[in-house]
């Protein structure tokens, strides 16, 4: 969006993205249901440009499970998915990277930020990437390349849960003082190809209850994508 605004107003602005994965989307495993509202605002003609939002959300089901039975519950309003899409979030990220590249955003896949850089006044100056090509004992190998420093007016950290640099920022700027502790969850996901007779494209099912006990938060999902594929997880 920054590049769009810079082009619109005729201003020079460089935007750089560091992606630690081998490509954008390589570390995005989610099969997700997303609202297109932000995409409508960012790229209004996303459908014409071939965004991989191929499966409109259809039937919504919310079930309470016991060990032997499933009880259908009213779907909470915040879980209604009319107008949303079932997607592979990795594919969406790859497509967004293509759109960003067309706007001359500099994207560096395979580079992880290893250090936060600071100005003399203590404010964030940017980040430095890690050295590449060191041997197992830390010495410079034949293909050694030193890390590079990236300086910016604004630096955004999108490391996900417990990011290594984000933790240092928490400590330096006391960002966790006086706030609730973070909450983490662990889950599994698989992508199944099922028989066409069993596939209901656009179907969305969420469950709560069994096999969790009554004191533990958790649940499962089943999303029917295109091509007889089902994203299933817990």
Put a short name on every predicted segment:
Residues 29, 76, 167-170:
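Short amphipathic alpha-helical segments
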Residues 1:
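Glycine-rich adenosine-cofactor-binding loop
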Residues 4, 8-12, 16, 20, ...:
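Predominantly flavin-linked oxidoreductase catalytic cores and closely associated redox partners
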Residues 5, 11-68, 165:
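N-terminal FAD cofactor-binding segment of flavoenzymes
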Residues 33, 86, 149:
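Short aromatic/basic micro-patch
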Residues 25-27, 83, 137:
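A generic structural signal for short coil/turn motifs at secondary-structure boundaries
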